[in-house]
A protein has these predicted regions:
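Charge-dense, helix-prone N-terminal extensions
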Residues: 1-155
């Protein structure tokens, strides 16, 4: 009597990720890597600064120039904020919480870069206030506004 033939083991079908763009999936992967690195690292300022500057250096123009300038403004205005990356973009944290971040236009195919603030930022102004700002260029007026926003954000 012969044994019944075994069915060939089939690999489970690869699930297609729906709902997220390739850029969003890339950003989530970058964030997962950042979380792992933070867990392993001592989370010192030099490591965060290095990661933020590397993210800026990887950007194309004009985002690179905008990000360099925003980085300089934030670090001069609020030296207590620690530079790091957040979803692959330069960000600035108070303790473990991100206060503000720069998002390049090219990352998500938008026509402007973004300076954003999280709920940690103390920007509250009545019942409604902006938390993100489009950037296409920086002159003295925009730089002064960013300085004021960062000062207010850290309280």
């Amino acid at each position: 009597m012969s044994k019944p033939a075994k069915k060939a083991a089939s690999k489970p079908a690869k699930k297609e990720t729906k709902g997220f763009t390739a850029e969003e999936r890339e950003a989530m992967k970058a964030r997962a890597q950042e979380l792992k690195a933070e867990a392993r690292a001592s989370k010192n300022r030099a490591e965060g600064e290095s990661a933020a500057l590397a993210a800026i250096a990887a950007m194309k123009e004009p985002d690179r120039t905008l990000a360099k300038r925003v980085h300089a403004i934030v670090t001069e205005t609020a030296p207590g904020l620690v530079p790091k990356t957040w979803y692959g973009m330069p960000a600035y944290a108070q303790g473990e919480k991100i206060v503000c971040f720069f998002q390049s236009a090219q990352k998500f195919g938008t026509r402007y870069a973004t300076l954003g603030f999280t709920a940690t930022a103390k920007l509250d102004d009545g019942a409604m206030w902006p938390i993100a700002f489009a950037l296409t260029k920086l002159d003295a007026a925009e730089e002064a506004r960013i300085r004021a926003l960062v000062k207010q954000a850290v309280g």
